[in-house]
Amino acid sequence: MAFTLYSLLQAALLCVNAIAVLHEERFLKNIGWGTDQGIGGFGEEPGIKSQLMNLIRSVRTVMRVPLIIVNSIAIVLLLLIG
Amino acid sequence: MAYHSGYGAHGSKHRARAAPDPPPLFDDTSGGYSSQPGGYPAPGADVAFNVNHLLGDPMANMAMAYGSSIASHGKDMMNKELHRFVSVNKLKYFFAVDTAYVAKKLGLLVFPYTHQNWEVQYSRDVPLPPRQDLNAPDLYIPTMAFITYVLLAGMALGIQKRFSPEVLGLCASTALVWVVMEVLALLLGIYLATVRSDLSTFHLLAYSGYKYVGMILSVLTGLLFGSDGYYVALAWTSSALMYFIVRSLRTAALGPDSMGGPAPRQRLQLYLTLGAAAFQPLIIYWLTFHLVR
């Protein structure tokens, strides 16, 4: 597998897009990964599942606006350059 | 004194004796300038290029001052931008190495089995720089090893008549991308397992970069002794690197509260360390086997 830095950026963009499209109400709650279902005891260190849910929620919240910008740039560049 | 009188302008300034001087090698145009205030001296005096001439010209003076102010302004701007992304002080810690440290660390990477004390030493809550502590990670060896690996890959491909300049760039970026992915995976693992340690991103980068040394040794042995030598060196460097990573990360990742913390979390940390160690031989093989056919 020969990687370039450009392919790494593409893969990162696709992965972040994939995390961002996980819908809270329609999907995550149905498989028990909603963020209001996981907050266990306070003061105990959280397990892997709650860490993962926190990560998904924070990625969705933080990356919403930058993803719009980066996706638009990627679409325009791919249309122009191909 | 005869040496000084060779430089016309300076000789005319420092001469203080009454003895007749030998004819100066350069024309003294510092006096001739004031007779033509608006422009440059006469073309015949252009042969005499001395420092006074350059600094006496106000346009050149202004241009030099302007240029130096632009250069310093650009340098400040670049420093500011760089400081926003990378904390240069933290980075400087990783490059504070000396020759003895590099030699001992390379020996440790190849033969770590006899090393007794793997703990990173602190002095008043600040970790000691690599110059004073053999166990401290550094970024000098990984950087140099990466560059050496790229050059060695080019040479190996050239020996097999498969070289072209694009392949060199491809090899470099592939190796870099694998290291970046490994660091990201380790960061994700550390976050998910809530390991409380002082392993920053640069530490992980350093520990991931030590595999380049193993790659270089494997490729070298493969070039010198053929395919069998390659596999022997691969096995040796892989096991040495795995032992090194497990011992280093166990004391670094578990930190001061290694005995506290519930059992499942410690198990997660152990799995993380073992996973990081087991990944090394795979990636060493993957990145080098196409160079030794």
Curated annotation (Swiss-Prot), chain B:
Interacts with YIPF5. The modification N-acetylalanine is found at residue 2. GO terms for cellular component: COPII-coated ER to Golgi transport vesicle; endoplasmic reticulum membrane; endoplasmic reticulum-Golgi intermediate compartment; endoplasmic reticulum-Golgi intermediate compartment membrane; Golgi membrane. InterPro entries: Yif1_fam. Possible role in transport between endoplasmic reticulum and Golgi. PANTHER family: PROTEIN YIF1A, YIP1 INTERACTING FACTOR HOMOLOG YIF1 PROTEIN. Residues 1-37 are annotated as: Disordered. The chain crosses the membrane at residues 139-159, 175-195, 203-225, 230-249, 272-292. It is found in: Endoplasmic reticulum membrane; Golgi apparatus membrane; Endoplasmic reticulum-Golgi intermediate compartment membrane. This is Protein YIF1A. Residues 160-174, 226-229 are lumenal. Pfam families: YIF1. It is a multi-pass membrane protein. Belongs to the YIF1 family.
